[in-house]
Every structure is written in structure tokens, then in C-alpha cells.
Amino acid sequence: MQHFSRTFLAASIATALFAPYAQAEAILNNSVQEMPTTDQCLVDAEKNDANAEIVIQADNLQAINGDKAIYSGDVEVTQGNKKITAESVTLHQQENIVVAEGNVTFNDGEVKASSSKVTNNMTSETFSLENTEYQFLCQQGRGQAAYIAKTGQAVYELEDGSITSCPADDNAWRLVASSIEVDQNEETATFYHPRFEVLDVPVFYAPYLTLPIGNTRKTGFLFPSVNYGSSDGLEIEVPFYWNIAPNYDLTLTTLYMQQRGVKQDADFRYLSDGWGAGELKGEYLPGDEKYNDEDRWGYQYKHDGIINKQWLVSLDYSQVSDIDYFRDLSSDLGNREDGQLMQQGKVAYRSDFWDMSLQVRDFQILLQDNNQPYRLLPQVKFNFYTPLLGNYLNFDVKSELTQFDIQDASKPNALRAHVEPGLTIPLSTSWATWTTEARLLATYYQQDLDRLTDPTLKSQLDETVARVIPEYRSHARIYLEREAKLFEGYTQSLEPQIQYLYVPEEEQGNIYNYDTTLLQTDYYGLFRSRKYSSIDKIAAANQLSYGASTRFFDDEYKERLNISFGQIYYIDKKTKLTGNQEETSNYSSWAVETDFNYEDFLFYHGGIQYDIDLNAMQLANSTLEYQFTDGFIQGNYRYVTKDYIEDTISFDELDKITRKGISQAGIVGAYNINRHWSASGQYYYDLTEEIDLEWMASLRYQSDCWYIGFTYTNQLVKWRNDVVGGDSNNPVYDTNISVNFGIQGFATKNKAETAAKELDSTDNAITYGRPFYLNN
């Protein structure tokens, strides 16, 4: 057989077999862009034209004019995005079919393969491959098959095939089936008689299975995840995703727990046309084998929507079967530290100058004590606001009508009506602001005392109370800036502010507390107009608040340091928080806040409230975090006196929580050891009770297609004999050692994270946070 140069062969074939395209072929062969030199997805490329030029290059040619041509020796066949290489290729001219044999490779921009034989119909764009290894280029997935046929534009049928998301030479897991149908347009793979293999060992079989293979929403099973823990034993989670419609979907998850039974979860999501979006979740565990065969269940419904740009609709309703639900079960409905579940609905309307809302609110209490909050059945709010003299005088009215209801007969039900008109003079320049405000707080109570079982409380309260209290506030702030002298190259700002607040004293002992708590008096709280969160208690005030903030900015105007400090001078000592007539000072505690960022790897935040009367700290918190290339380490501390807690929250049995206040220290860290291994951990200790609060350590391996994690947790769940400082010296802990395994690549419910990322998603009571408040 005569040998020809490759260029001469290409021109000869084009002339002899495809004369109409000879000129085009000559041009194409002078180009260096016949095909991409690397394997890449060409799904967005222009589709192949069945009449497009066919370019064949080979070392040898045996041609039968008008019938077929046989090419051999480094054969390449290209047509548009298609490319076939083989030891020999036979072109059947009449049928427009190419048959390639011997070390065949195939690439059409969507899939690449190596086979012993490939048959390609250039007209219908169908092909078949025998004894093939393949890889999808536009989605994750590769595998092997005895026979592959492309029967549609993006439909592949495989016989005796396998598929995995693992890279080449890695068969950590794979799905093997007698028949597989892959639809790349629909991004689904249908398996007949599939078996799931781990390291070539079968671990699961099903007669039929459909899985998504892309990132779009497709109906089908998602890959299961496996976990083993000392608390619940072996756990296997199998999710099924149902793409009901473009704006509706449903995820059904079956969770098998060796020591508990089978738990069913459902998550329905929707997006309505003009009504907003919502989500309905449900969980059900029949006959919990670990807890006396009790049926455990929970559900949650949330909806938020804005209608016609003016109406707002919001619904948030959750309920579980028992108060220990989150303590005993891992749930998407809440966390183990939740003390109550919200059950509320709200409808609101807003216009340019007024808004109104109707709200109902209830709670499911998840605590054993009797500290029940009030229900709002309902609460109606109306607000009006308008400028009177351009930008120099504003008028507004805040009002509400609330019905408070509670099942506890030791507390009264009540109707509260409140109207609060106000005038505001806002003055501002580029370097200063001055706001003066006068308000009138008028409130009416109708309290139901007939049902009270507490005679002492009944004698203190009045059935009807009308209260009118004026309020005056004037707040000024200046912004100054200069080149810093202490730190060269930095810009320093100074922001002093001062506020005068006057609220006359009013006897309010005849009003019960329905929804009011004391607000935290940190630096920013010094300049509020109210000390309480609501209006059941209006604290008297005749005081001057003053303070300042200074900030340092680098040459890119990135904030690197700020310090804020201030306090209150009580002109009338009787208006101090404690109301103690024996107070020796007219000054409040000093409030100090600071944040620091050094070169974006060392961060610090600290805050204190220091009582100058007692020469003691009331509240403090401090966090220092060091970040490096592959991880971080953080130390934190928080301190609150018991007196401060008693003044701030209402809790009948505070000794069950603390006897000396809060003094807790913790350390949190995470490190990516290398590309695959990562570790994280955290530890918290209570310095007042001298006991551990929480341990957590995690080690995780993550490959390209699977992951495995090992986690140890030890969490405090019960104080000594239910009372802090009780006779027992042995607090109760919940200890769990778990191993979880999962698949990555496609058709997974949750993507695996590194151990560092998992600090944000664990069920720990104290989660990782970054309380750094610099303006960057």
C-alpha cells in the first residue's frame, strides 16, 4: 500500500469522496483551530451540522470509489465538534457511517471515550461504542460499559455499565447496573438493577433507580449518607427529591436509626406568583425505641411575601411533640438550646406616610418551669409620619392595641392601648448631627384580675390604669478627622457625642409586666431614649450621656482600630437603674467597646461595663482570633454578674441556671492539614462552677468524590440535682462519638464541608462566631 503525507491524504480524500466541499476543506486544513487541544465542555457551542465538512487524516488509504474508504495509521476524523482517533477507520460513503477500530478515542464536546470499536452515523448524529471507558465533559461522571449507544441529541444508553463521580484511577465508589440511561438535557441517570459498590464491594441493590447528575433541579433519589454514633447507633439517610414544578419542589428523607427506628422527614418549598415564598417541613418518628416507644413529631411552616409593593404577609408556625424533642433528635426545625418555638402570623400595609399591621403570636414552651410568655391575641399597630417644615421638623404618631393572654392563672390577662405622638427636629451637616425630640407616651391598661390566684399580686395591681408620660431627648454628635500622629500613614477620626434625656418619674407598680425587659447598657445603649424594650415600664430619667469613639484607617481607608467609651451622669440619682437611695455616685458604669484588626490575620473585640460605685465589673466579653493560611484559632471569654442578670431578665428560678453569674472561657480552632484532611475543635469551661460546659473535636477526610468524618462531643445537659450548687458533684453530660460517610459529586443532599466550616453547622450549644465590628 502506497504511503502519502497526511496533508496530501486529507486533500485527496476531500476531492475524491466529497468534491462539493473541496474548497472548504483546503481552507480548513490551513487553520490551526480544527478542534480544541484540551478536553473541555462544548455544550454551549453551535450544534453539529449533518452536512458539515468531514476531515479525515491518516497515514494510509485504501479507497473504493463511490462505496467506502479504509484509513489506517494514526487516523483522525473530525466533523464540527466531533473527533475520532483510531488505528483504522472505515468510511461508508453511501450510508455516511464511520466505523473506527483499534484504540479508538471519541470526543464530541459533551463526552469523551476510549473504546475497542466506535460506529458513528454522521447524518443522524447517533453512535455506538464497545468495551468503553467514558467521561462526561459537561457534568461530573465517568465509568465503563460493554456497550454505549447515543440514541438522541444528548441521550446515552449503557449496557453492563458503571458510573462514578470519582476521578480517573479512583474507584472508591461506583454504581454498577445491567443497563443505564443517561439524559444530559434532563441531567438524569436511570439505572436498571443497580448495585452500589464501595472499593468494588457491593453494599446496596435496587431493581430500579433514578438519580440527578447535574446541579439543576431534577426528580430522583439523592445519594445516601451513613453515620455511626454512640448515641443512636448506625444511621442511614436516603433522600428523594421531587421536582414538582418550576416553582414547587419536595424533598422526602428516610432516616434509619439503629437504636431509634425509622424517621421520615419532608420539606416542601414553593414560590408563588405575587404572594411570596414559603416552606413546610415535617418530621415523624413512630415508636421511638429509645424513649418508651413514644411517637415523636414536629412541623414548621414559614411564608413571607410582599404583595403589590405595599402589603406584607408573614407566617412562622412551629410545633413539636414534646419539650425534649430537640434534645433527643437532630432536627431542621430547631436547636437543642431552643427554649420556645415561635407561632406567629402578621399582615401589614405600608404607604408613603403611614403603615399598619395586625399580628398574632403564641409560643410552644420547651422548658419545665412555669415561665410562660404572653400571647398576642392580637396586636394592632398604626404609625403615621410626615415632615411639617421641610427637613427641619418631623411629626409622627406610634400607636398599638394589644390583647395579652396567658394560661397561667397566677398572671393577669390584659388589654393595652398606647398612643405616642412625637415631634423631631433633625439638623445635620457633613461633620455633625443634632436631633431634638419631644414625645408624649399615653397608655391605657385594662387588666383582668378576677382570675388571679396570687392574692399579693392582685392587691398590687389595678384593673384599669391610665398613664401619660412626656419624654424629651436631645442628642448631638460631631465627626472630626485628621492624620494620625501616633501611627504614621493612618487617618484618625474622633466622634464625640452627648445626649440629654428627661422622663418624669411615674408610679407604675400597679401595672404588670407583659412584654418588657431591661435593655443591655453597652456603649451604644448609653444613647437610647428607653431603658426597657417595651412600654410596660417607662424608666424615669434626668440624665446626661456622653462618650466618644475614635477610629484608625489605613491608607486604603480600611478601619483597623476603634475604641468607644462613655457613661451616664444622673442629675437625679433616684433615676439610676437600681433606684437605691443610698447610691453614693451620680455616675453609671463605664461602658467601653474596642475592635482591632492587625494586617487581616489578628482580630480582637472586647467590651466591659465597670461599676465605679462597687469598683467591680458588671459585664465583660473578649474575643481574640488569629487566622493563618490553613486555619484559625480563637479564644473568648464572657462575664456577667448575677445581679445584672436579675435586673435584665425575668426568671422565677434563676438558681437553676446560675448561682454566681456567668464566667465562661472557651477556645475554638480549625486547621486544614492538607488538601484532603482537616480538623477542628472547641472547648468551653465554666469558671464559677468549675466544670466543663462543652467539648467538641472533629477530624475529616474529603476526597474529590467522598468524605468521612469522625466527631466527638461532650455537652452539659443537666446541673447538679437540677439546682446549681446542689449536693451532687456530678453534672450530667451527653457524650457522643460519631462517624459519618457520604458521597460527593452529584445527586447529594448536602455538600460536605471542611471541619472548619462544620463549626458553624454542628448541634453544639455554643457555636463559632466572629464578633468583630469594624467598617471594612
From Swiss-Prot:
Annotated keywords: Cell outer membrane, Membrane, Signal
Compartment list: Cell outer membrane
GO annotation, cellular component aspect: cell outer membrane; transporter complex
Record has Signal as a keyword: yes
Protein's GO biological process: Gram-negative-bacterium-type cell outer membrane assembly; lipopolysaccharide transport
Main subcellular localisation: membrane
Domain of life: Bacteria
Residues annotated as signal peptide: 1-24
Described function: Together with LptE, is involved in the assembly of lipopolysaccharide (LPS) at the surface of the outer membrane.
Oligomeric and partner information: Component of the lipopolysaccharide transport and assembly complex. Interacts with LptE and LptA.
Family: Belongs to the LptD family.
Protein name from the UniProt record: LPS-assembly protein LptD
Organism: Vibrio vulnificus (strain CMCP6)
Lineage: Bacteria, Pseudomonadati, Pseudomonadota, Gammaproteobacteria, Vibrionales
